[in-house]
Amino acid sequence: MIKEVTDQYNAKEIETKVHEFWEANNAYRSVREHRKGAKKFYFVDGPPYTTGHIHLGTAWNKIIKDSILRYMSMNDHDILDRAGWDMHGLPIEVKVEGALGFESKKDIETYGVGNFIEKCKEFALRQKDDMTEQFQTLGVWLDWEDPYMTLKDEYIEAAWWTLKQAQDKNLLETGKRVVNWCPRCETAIADAEVEYEDREDPSTYIKFKLKDEDNTFVVIWTTTPWTIPSNIAVAVHPEFEYSKVKAISENSATEILIIASELVENVLRIGRYLDYEILSTMSGKDLEGTVYEHPLADLVPLQAEIEHRICNADYVTADSTGCVHIAPGHGVDDFEVGVKNEFPIFCPVGPNGSYTHEAGKYCGMNILDANRVVMDDLLERGLLMAERMISHRYGHCWRCKTAIIYLATEQWFLKIGELKEDMLEEIKKVNWTPEWAGSARFKDWIEGARDWCISRQRYWGIPIPVWKCSSCNSLTVVGTRKELIERSGADPHIELHRPYVDKVTIPCECGGTMKRVEDVFDVWFDSAVASWATLRFPHQKEKFNEWWPADFITEGHDQTRGWFYSQLGASMVAFGKAPYKNVLMHGFTLDGSGKKMSKSIGNVIQPAEVIDKFGADTLRSYVLSASAPWEDLKFNWDELATVHRTNNILWNVYRFPLPYMALDDFDPQKVSYESVEAYLRSEDKWILSRMQTVIAEVNKAMDARLLHKAMRSINEFVLEDLSRWYIQLIRPRTWVEADNPDKLAVYRVLYDVFVTTAKLIAPFMPHLAEEMYQNLVRNIDENAPVTIHLCDWPVVNEALVDTSLEAQMKVARSIVEASSNARQKVGRKLRWPVSRIVVSPTDENTIAAVEGLRSVLMDQTNAKDIETTKVGESWNELGVESTPNPGAIGPVFKGNAGNISAAIGAMDAYDLKKGLAGGEMEISLADGTNVTITEKMVNFSETVPEDVGSAEFNCGVVFVDAKLTHEIESEGYSREVIRRIQDMRKELDLDVDDSIRGHIQISDERVLDLVLDFENYIAKEVRANVLVIGLDVETTGELAKEWNVEGIPMTIAISKEE
């Protein structure tokens, strides 16, 4: 039996109850098992790092995923949705280092790599459990019992297998290249892991002396003076013009400088030169091969052995000096220039960011501390032209926030550059939401892609499965645990992490011993193999063939250069195709002013904070409806509260008929739609049609991954169609005591609409949907699906669709709104009836709407009658006013214009309008002369009669005739009395079926007579078995109150009838 529910939407109570219900009934597993054998839908969960509490961004991410998966499940899809966890890498290591008080890799080595690995594992697993609980609080359904975890050996084997494919396809290589380097973590980091922040650095202009020309210098500019000890060359653009300038300094010294011609004046101004003369010009091509002296060759002995010369490079820009200092060991472009020109790759900097012995004087110094020392040495030699500080964007390590450097180191690379064109072709086959995420943003990133550095010089990660012979230097890549055991004789149960796997050796064909290289994988390579590792590939090839590639993935827009990219790269290496079919790119969560949420700023909002205040479903519906998924979400507490009010309105709409249904023992199994179809009114047919339209709208939006449109369609339906319209139309029909078919028709319609609405909100607000379903369906039919999430998604019933009726009702609602506005103008409350409303329409459809929905309009406008004029015609009871138009009269009648205006003003407006119907008419002036005037010389306006209000709407004008009659006053005062008594019933907390005794004292005899005319009506409406109304009635009872009703004092007393 359907039960009544609480007055208020108590999200926390409902969600706790629903979670317990799901757990007790193993709901998630039941839903997944129920869809076995249906069309497969493979979802890969982009794995969050197990580093701590979830934040609003990760909450939004999982809510999007959960909503789409619930929708697909109800649409009969067999879903594979293992939750994913990224459990390796610096995100974990830095957290553990912080907990242990470590500051460098040396501390880890001292502590013991094995001990550190165990601490990382413990931390990752503990945080995984905590975060799982937080996601479950949001109502997120994934396979939490069998998640994929990158620390598991089966997952590690998928990564190993992938690297072996790279080797087999000649896509794996090792060598020295310049990479992003974190000197604190002492490891390479990916481009996607570099976070840019503003910082101040030296802006220095430095002179390099030409070897064979006295007092002649090429001028370079740099913000990294610490790289000068590593300088090998100077690059100029081959097509730029350069000037050889004779410059006079402040001390009147003369020197010759080489600078890009268009930059000469700016550079000399910065260098504080007094005057200059251009001696000659040449192209960058002419400068190629010019030899210069290293400015610090005496301090860095190895530099004295190297010939330094000017070379050409097309990437040089016409800013600063037009001459670029080249240090191949400290810049990606510099490295490429070095390789092209066969320069030595000189890199006298160690992994901790300190100079090595190769740096001579600077050995042991931290490079950033050395900036000042280098500049002083240059100054001492007269080679520092200028220095100042500038603020610019500079890269920092994503985890420890240390400023990165560029360092030439030995690394392992996947040859992504060779696959670039194939990758670009593959992404064209992927369905992107929004479209430009793939065709523009992702495409641009791939076009600029370089070979992927997959190695990291750390501990907690997937060990790179490369073994190298210490005798002959030959390499081998191991693809699986089985292969490793077979080739090494290692313990079959060996763990595949460091330091355990480091101890395993493999015999080499040369008779030597192969040892594993110490590097671990880039953590992005871990998650890159997720789509096949999730399927336990390579061990379960059949499952892989059934499910792969993924049908759907979604992550934030930063993942165009992160997970979307790494997956594509690894998949192209392994399989030669994209690993996903459909991608939704979503935005970031920001604070209300559009700033990134940050603990340091203090603007972070935790999901738990929102849930404690409003509940998980409100958070879910807010993040899903507030903006398009791909737009950044600016979190706003007021907007969140508005969404919560909308959910509360849904609750109240759902709650409204339940007491009446319970009182009447309404059983939808016994009252079929067919049994009441003949008794459906226009409003019933309309809401059923609107329900079908909303189903179609939600289907269209969800199929296009436009979750915001789906949510907004549902919210609009609940707010505008159900709460503000349909419930108002049918409310009196639910109060009828008799078991009549009209009331049963309303019950049946409401029931169907509520059950369908519950199914529509199930993907988005699963807790509220479940609560509604259990009461409406399971309380009636114990054989119905145990949970709403086992139900099929609503299907549009074309037989119920009536687009014409929907259009007419839209017009009717506009008329009602206009009528309300017109009432306000004459000060007449809606509670008071009016004798009629008149609609002056602009089209025939409006007339059809009025005629088709006359009873609805009369009821909602509280009018005794409704009339229409012909299309385009004014109401014939309107008055007409006329005024002369000086702008049209003056140019024609010149000095006589005043007399013409006076004559027009003295005439009857109706006569004028009639006379000018043909365009012009003749009028007489005061002096007896006649003149001809045109219609443009008179302005006409309509006036409404007294006690009539008017208001325009999009299809015409509504007039409300608010003249008072005896009957209207009687009904008006009676309705005022009824409202007061109903308020008093609520104050006494009476049930809808409780009867009362009432006594009403009215001091005004005229009003008393008016109210007495509706005595029986009042008694019926307030369920009064006894109702006494008079001048001197004794007003005692359980509750007595004095009221001022339209200026008339009244005292009302009521008591519950026992």
UniProtKB/Swiss-Prot annotation:
This entry's Enzyme Commission designation comes to 6.1.1.5
CDD domains attached here? Answer: Anticodon_Ia_Ile_ABEc, IleRS_core
Q: What family is reported? A: Belongs to the class-I aminoacyl-tRNA synthetase family. IleS type 2 subfamily.
UniProt-recorded name of the protein = Isoleucine--tRNA ligase
Q: Name one Pfam family in it.
A: tRNA-synt_1
**Domain remark in the UniProt entry:** IleRS has two distinct active sites: one for aminoacylation and one for editing. The misactivated valine is translocated from the active site to the editing site, which sterically excludes the correctly activated isoleucine. The single editing site contains two valyl binding pockets, one specific for each substrate (Val-AMP or Val-tRNA(Ile)).
Task: Please indicate if the UniProt record lists Cytoplasm as a keyword.
Answer: yes
Q: What are the GO MF terms of this UniProt record? A: aminoacyl-tRNA deacylase activity; ATP binding; isoleucine-tRNA ligase activity; tRNA binding; zinc ion binding
* Localization (cell): Cytoplasm
- Species whose genome carries this gene: Methanococcoides burtonii (strain DSM 6242 / NBRC 107633 / OCM 468 / ACE-M)
Entry keyword set:
Aminoacyl-tRNA synthetase, ATP-binding, Cytoplasm, Ligase, Metal-binding, Nucleotide-binding, Protein biosynthesis, Zinc
